[in-house]
UniProtKB/Swiss-Prot annotation:
Residues 787-811 are annotated as: Disordered. It is found in: Cell membrane; Cytoplasm. It comes from Geobacillus kaustophilus (strain HTA426). Part of the Sec protein translocase complex. Interacts with the SecYEG preprotein conducting channel. Has a central role in coupling the hydrolysis of ATP to the transfer of proteins into and across the cell membrane, serving as an ATP-driven molecular motor driving the stepwise translocation of polypeptide chains across the membrane. GO terms for cellular component: cell envelope Sec protein transport complex; cytosol; plasma membrane. CDD domains: DEXDc_SecA, SF2_C_secA. PANTHER family: CHLOROPLAST PROTEIN-TRANSPORTING ATPASE, SECA INNER MEMBRANE COMPONENT OF SEC PROTEIN SECRETION SYSTEM. This is Protein translocase subunit SecA 1. Its main location: membrane. It catalyses: ATP + H2O + cellular proteinSide 1 = ADP + phosphate + cellular proteinSide 2. Belongs to the SecA family. The gene is secA1. ATP binds at Q85, G103, E104, G105, K106, T107, D492. InterPro entries: Helicase_ATP-bd (IPR014001), Helicase_C-like (IPR001650), P-loop_NTPase (IPR027417), SEC_C_motif (IPR004027), SecA (IPR000185), SecA_CS (IPR020937), SecA_DEAD (IPR011115), SecA_motor_DEAD (IPR014018). It holds the Pfam family SecA_PP_bind.
Length: 837
């Protein structure tokens, strides 16, 4: 009954019926398009663009545009997209995922929605897993787009800025997920607007979408710079600050915990470091380190604000007195305290920018993807990316035979059987593709085949171009190919002459993967386009997945039945048990990714704010308005800190306020305590603001306006980049240590959100303060240059497709207490023979 209901209410069926209607309409235009000359076909592109500009939507143009691409493909590539490919194309245009089996022509399917969306002139990105595939597709499909009058760009790592700009300005850009992500990050670190390469993100089609959005979703892209000099500076600044005297060289205000160098202290610093002006822009870093060392010595007390444990400085929560593991003071204060305590200074890992694929791809207005296997992860695509998965039927029915798993007792027995199977098939000339989970396994199998004298190829996802050639040959008579899961993705295995009669390509899996999806990918390598084929998985009770989900009872059963290593179990029940184990692992992985995304969202919101504001700085001609707002909020904060509402005006610390103004905003004597006495905080703010504005105007008058504007931009960009870099670092440290808070009955995620928000507010305040100080205090030179705060290096996540190495399980003689007893009773060792031990 359930089966009948499912058929009636199957949403995929409804989708397909709708898609089929559209495909029929496209098909009906076939003869009309065939009558057009090449020139008339090319003219269609201009006609569509004009109609789009006049207000027709892409959906209105879809049927005709798809028909044009279809006809173009026939003339240029000699390929005519099938109806199922048109259906897949519609799914992609609608921003969903088309699940199309291997060999169904995904690359050609994508050309139709790519062309349609490129008519907007906003740029379409086609994303692949490696540069070999990007180059191959851009070259092959590029012929079709160029025939239809579109421009095609290829975005590879190592290209110059000009080459990248040209690639992104094309109608259609091919590239890898890594490169698109890194370009986004680099664009938000540029010092000149003209250096930006990407246009606003509009529409992307991701090939092998499951691999990029799920398997690699948690991989962060990181651009990092190193700060080698800084460790030395912390030590030098620390030694210098030890020589200073309170009230002579610096002033300290207990209430606001603010510490300032006096004129005398500033002179001392200039003498000690042999410089003429501490507030010169070229001494920003030194000044920063001296301020940090001062704060570490004067405002931070050991065993009150922090404790030292195992050579590490750990912060004490001022409200609860708990140790805040994993939290580090930001902006280098933590390192300054380490220098003060004579500990090893943890080198700042300068992450200049970072983003995960999940968050990068969620920024596109419209996102679509295609893959052979996505249905098992449908829930994740829907929840996180708001994409549906539509299973597109194959052009010809699949006649591959998927046999139930063969389960052996030990790994040794399993591999012996695999080699026998390969040898038997090789003898009759049937091509074999063997899939392994780890590189070690493929090397071990290769050794075993060498001993038997069977010629074969081994692929380990290291050299994409060469592997594509080998994989393409894997369907020839007598070919034996061993490949790790990811090797040669995106390349078709076409059958050689006479192979069909031998039963097509045989796919042998040597172990089940954690994810059903990857097993299905391996199976799908055989039986493309209605070819015959067979797939068979060999498992053993010692495989990792089997061990994780209780293979003891099976082991005991095999022993009781007196089965040895050479006799496998082949049963649907066991196959189902394996699948349910895989479902559990997939569920766990999904939860982990979902949780990570919630943590990541905190940084994502902050990143978007910072990047948006940074772009405004690059884009605006005159920053004075923005800077005045910053200075005003600094004045408000400082006045309010020194004149708390709960104190009577006589107790207000006006001396501290004047000292702050002298150190950061105004020349000495501009505002005195007498000027401020008897005034309300609002009046003080107005008075100080008027003085600051007057000084700002004086600066403006002394130098040409364009130089002043450039000076402002240098100061703001530097402050934002520096503080943001420290902030990313502090957020990462917070995230590493936050899970320890769960012991205190608090939700780590909420804590992370609250503290992350507070740290962000602190960072904004620090940016404003630094900008205010340098605008008001620095001397302006004629040869100002914008500077990067550190040289950025893109840290590539593991090379595409390289699986994290999984060690083969080695047998040990020692029996663990919870292991099955070696006597074969089926009980745990501790309840059986282990009792007496």
């Amino acid at each position: 009954m359930l089966g009948v209901l499912k058929k009636v209410f199957d949403p995929n069926k409804r989708q397909l019926a709708r898609l089929e209607k559209i495909a029929d309409q496209v098909d009906a235009l076939g003869p009309e398009m065939a009558r057009l000359s090449d020139e008339q076909l090319r003219q269609k592109t201009e006609e569509f663009k004009a109609r789009y500009q006049q207000g027709e939507s892409l959906d209105d143009l879809l049927v005709e545009a798809f028909a044009v691409v279809r006809e173009g493909a026939k003339r240029v590539l000699g390929l005519y997209p099938y109806k199922v490919q048109i259906m897949g194309g519609v799914v992609l245009h609608e921003g969903d995922i088309a699940e199309m089996k291997t060999g169904e022509g995904k690359t050609l399917t994508a050309t139709m929605p790519v062309y349609l969306n490129a008519l907007t002139g906003r740029g379409v990105h086609v994303v692949t897993v490696n540069e070999y595939l990007a180059t191959r597709d851009a070259t092959e499909m590029g012929k079709l787009y160029e025939f239809l009058g579109m421009t095609v760009g290829l975005n590879l790592s190592g290209m110059s800025r000009e080459e990248k700009q040209a690639a992104y300005n094309a109608d259609i850009t091919y590239g890898t997920n890594n490169e698109f992500g890194f370009d986004y990050l680099r664009d938000n670190m540029v010092l000149y607007k003209e250096h930006i390469v990407q246009r606003p993100l509009y529409y992307a089609i991701i090939d092998e979408v499951d691999s990029i959005l799920i398997d690699e979703a948690r991989t962060p892209l990181i651009i990092s710079g190193t700060a080698q000099k800084s460790t030395k500076l912390y030590v030098q600044a620390n030694a210098f600050v030890r020589t200073l005297r309170k009230d002579v060289d610096y002033t300290y205000d207990e209430k606001t915990k603010s510490v300032q160098l006096t004129e005398e202290g500033i002179n001392k610093a200039e003498r000690a470091f042999g410089i003429d002006n501490l507030f010169d822009l070229k001494h920003v870093t030194l000044n920063h380190h001296i301020q940090l060392a001062l704060r570490a010595h004067v405002t931070m007390q050991r065993d009150v604000d922090y404790v030292v444990q195992d050579g590490k400085v750990i912060i004490v929560d001022p409200f609860t007195g708990r140790l805040m593991h994993g939290r580090r003071y930001s902006d280098g204060l933590h390192q300054a305290i380490e220098a003060k305590e004579g500990l090893e200074i943890q080198n700042e890992s300068m992450t200049l920018a970072t983003i995960t694929f999940q968050n990068y791809f969620r920024m596109y207005e419209k996102l679509a993807g295609m893959t052979g296997t996505a249905k098992t992860e449908e829930e994740e695509f829907r929840n996180i990316y708001n994409m549906r998965v539509v299973v597109i039927p194959t052009n010809r029915p699949v006649i591959r035979e998927d046999r139930p798993d063969l389960i052996y007792r030990t790994m040794e027995g399993k591999f012996r059987a695999v080699v026998e199977d390969i040898a038997a098939r090789h003898a009759k000339g049937q091509p074999v593709l063997v899939g392994t989970v780890a590189i070690e396994t493929s090397e071990m199998l290769s050794e075993m085949l060498k001993k038997r004298g069977i010629p074969h190829n081994v692929l380990n996802a290291k050299n994409h171009a060469k592997e594509a050639e080998i994989i393409a040959q894997a369907g020839q008579k007598g070919a034996v190919t061993i490949a790790t899961n990811m090797a040669g993705r995106g390349t078709d295995i076409k059958l050689g002459e006479g192979v069909k009669e031998l039963g097509g390509l045989a796919v042998i899996g040597t172990e089940r993967h954690e994810s059903r999806r990857i097993d299905n990918q391996l199976r799908g390598r055989s039986g493309r386009q209605g070819d015959p084929g067979v797939s068979q998985f060999y498992l053993s009770l010692e495989d990792e997945l089997m061990r994780r989900f209780g293979s003891e009872s099976l082991m005991a059963m095999m022993d009781r039945l007196g089965m040895d290593d050479s006799q496998p179990i082949q049963s649907k029940m066991v196959t189902r048990a394996v699948e349910s184990a895989q479902k559990r692992v997939e569920g766990n992985n999904f939860d982990a990714r979902k949780q990570l995304l919630q943590y990541d969202d905190v940084l994502r919101e902050q990143r978007e704010i910072i990047y948006r504001q940074r772009y405004e700085v690059l884009d605006s001609d005159n920053l004075r308005g923005i800077i005045e707002k910053m200075i005003h909020s600094v004045i408000e904060r400082v006045v309010n800190a020194h004149t708390p509402k709960e104190e009577v005006p006589e107790e207000w610390n006006l001396k501290g306020l004047v000292e702050y103004l002298n150190a950061h905003l105004l020349p000495e004597g501009d505002v005195t305590e007498a000027d401020l006495r008897g005034k309300e905080p609002e009046e003080m703010i107005e008075l100080i603001w008027a003085k600051v504005k007057a000084r700002y105007d004086e600066k403006e008058a002394q130098i040409p306006p364009e130089q002043m504007r450039e000076f402002e931009r240098v100061v703001v960009l530097r402050a934002v980049d520096m503080k943001w870099m420290h902030h990313i670092d502090a957020m990462e440290q917070l995230r590493q240590g936050i899970h320890l808070r769960a012991y205190g009955q608090v939700d780590p995620l909420r804590e992370y959100q609250m503290e992350g928000y507070a740290m962000f507010e602190e960072m904004i305040a620090a940016i404003e303060e630094e900008v205010a100080t340098y605008i008001m205090k620095a001397e302006i030179h004629h040869n100002l240059e914008r500077q990067e705060v550190a040289k950025g290096e893109a840290v590539h996540p593991k090379e595409d497709g390289e699986e994290p190495k999984r060690k083969p399980v080695r047998k040990a003689v020692r029996v663990g207490r919870n292991d099955p007893c070696p006597c074969g009773s089926g009980k745990k060792y501790k309840h059986c023979c282990g009792r007496t031990v």
